[in-house]
């Protein structure tokens, strides 16, 4: 995450410097999804191709696993730096849902995904993950 991204989400938490909340997190994720689908579309298509190839090559699978673990650690650290109270399990769920959402968006025809659509999906993602667990 860039310094500008951290500043934007920190500001979204409120002028008092309060920690960022779910709304700010959804805004950040929505912007990230849209940026990935537009400016970095080819990069993410290649990353998904690589992930699929890792199912056939054990050495690549190991490297992808290490990459995933590093992504979890760095994302959790970013959440802490922003004052987000997400648990490691919630961060892992956010990453999984982000990747699934990004895959859906990146295979859509170029130019068809809007920033608003990415934000709606991001809000659903954050709401679902951060919702208090309900006893069954």
Residue ranges and their predicted role:
Residues 2-44, 91-94:
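Hydrophobic alpha-helical connector segments
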Residues 24-28, 51-54, 121:
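Short juxtamembrane and helix-loop transition motifs at transmembrane-helix boundaries
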Residues 33, 47, 51, 94-101:
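Short alpha-helical scaffolding segments that buttress acidic/His motifs in well-ordered protein cores
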Residues 28, 46, 70, 93, ...:
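Charged catalytic carboxylate motif
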Residues 4-11, 74-78, 101, 105:
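A short secondary-structure junction motif
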Residues 61, 65, 79-136:
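Hydrophobic/aromatic-rich alpha-helical bundle segments in the mid-to-C-terminal region
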Residues 38-58:
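Amphipathic alpha-helical segments used for helix-helix packing
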Residues 63-70, 74:
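Short, solvent-exposed amphipathic helices
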């Amino acid at each position: 995450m860039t310094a500008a991204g951290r500043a934007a989400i920190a500001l979204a938490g409120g002028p008092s410097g309060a920690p960022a909340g779910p709304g700010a997190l959804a805004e950040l994720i929505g912007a990230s999804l849209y940026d990935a689908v537009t400016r970095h579309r080819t990069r993410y298509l290649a990353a998904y191709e690589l992930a699929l190839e890792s199912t056939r090559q054990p050495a690549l699978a190991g490297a992808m696993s290490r990459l995933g673990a590093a992504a979890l650690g760095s994302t959790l650290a970013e959440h802490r730096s922003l004052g987000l109270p997400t648990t490691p399990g919630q961060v892992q769920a956010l990453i999984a849902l982000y990747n699934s959402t990004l895959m859906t968006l990146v295979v859509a025809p170029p130019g068809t995904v809007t920033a608003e659509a990415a934000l709606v999906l991001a809000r659903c993602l954050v709401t679902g993950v951060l919702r208090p667990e309900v006893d069954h």
